[in-house]
A protein has these predicted regions:
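Metal-dependent nuclease catalytic cores that hydrolyze phosphodiester bonds in DNA/RNA
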Residues: 1-167
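Mg2+/Mn2+-dependent nuclease catalytic core
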Residues: 147, 153-228
Length: 228
């Protein structure tokens, strides 16, 4: 599904902007494009020319989990508004996989939405998400960090040294405490497992951009703590 930019952004702090508008913007560079530039300028150019925000199930699952987690912590209802739950067992031809024409058309209709799409059961599903939420709710540290926070502020600014227009979208900001939190979902949350993910996926690049965005836009005067 193609994203069409419906809002023109300028430097500043934005609340509750549409995620598709955020990603469709090409005037400002995000950490995703910077990660490609680290590989090479050819990777960077290819990303800018060909990035069509192809839907990936693990991105949908991660974003949907963030919404569910923040709903639990802050008594909101963003998950119901932003997430579509479907059941693969309800496909027209249950005895066939999604290579069949009917099943393929059925799934294509479901995918034609701006909402995050999550399966009812399976590995990346509502079933899995409920277990993760129960674990988080029982953790006092997580509760302390996530309750009464601002979720997904979008920050746009121009870097003074390079003149580049940059953007970032921290998951959680505790503005009064000058704390930034980026929620990550992973299969192995052990220190070594997460460390490998952080290195392989360049999490520090994203973290630096999030902290810099908070400072440059004036959202925070200092960053006291940053959490993954």
């Amino acid at each position: 599904m193609e994203n069409i930019l419906t809002k023109k952004f300028t430097n500043g702090i934005y609340d509750h902007i549409n995620i598709d508008d955020y990603h469709a913007d090409r005037e400002y560079l995000s950490s995703s494009s910077i990660k490609e530039a680290i590989k090479s300028l050819k990777h960077f150019r290819h990303y800018l020319d060909n990035n069509n925000n192809e839907r990936k199930s693990h991105f949908d699952f991660g974003n949907a989990f963030e919404l569910a987690l923040m709903d639990v912590m802050n008594n909101t209802a963003e998950f119901d508004n932003e997430v579509l739950v479907f059941d693969e067992t309800e496909r027209p031809e249950v005895d066939k996989n999604f290579n069949s024409t009917l099943n393929k058309e059925w799934k294509a209709e479901i995918m034609d939405t701006k909402k995050y799409i999550i399966n009812k059961v399976g590995l990346e599903s509502v079933e899995t998400m409920k277990l993760m939420l129960e674990s988080c709710w029982q953790d006092e540290t997580i509760q302390g960090l996530l309750k009464n926070t601002d979720y997904q502020k979008s920050l746009f600014w121009t870097d003074k040294e390079t003149g580049l227009n940059l953007k970032t979208r921290p998951d959680v900001c505790k503005v009064n405490k000058c704390v930034v939190i980026d929620i990550k979902t992973c299969k192995d949350a052990s220190p070594s497992g997460f460390g490998k993910d952080a290195a392989n996926l360049n999490y520090p690049i994203q973290a630096v951009l999030q902290m810099r965005g908070c400072l440059e836009t004036g959202l925070m005067s200092v960053i006291n703590k940053y959490y993954w």
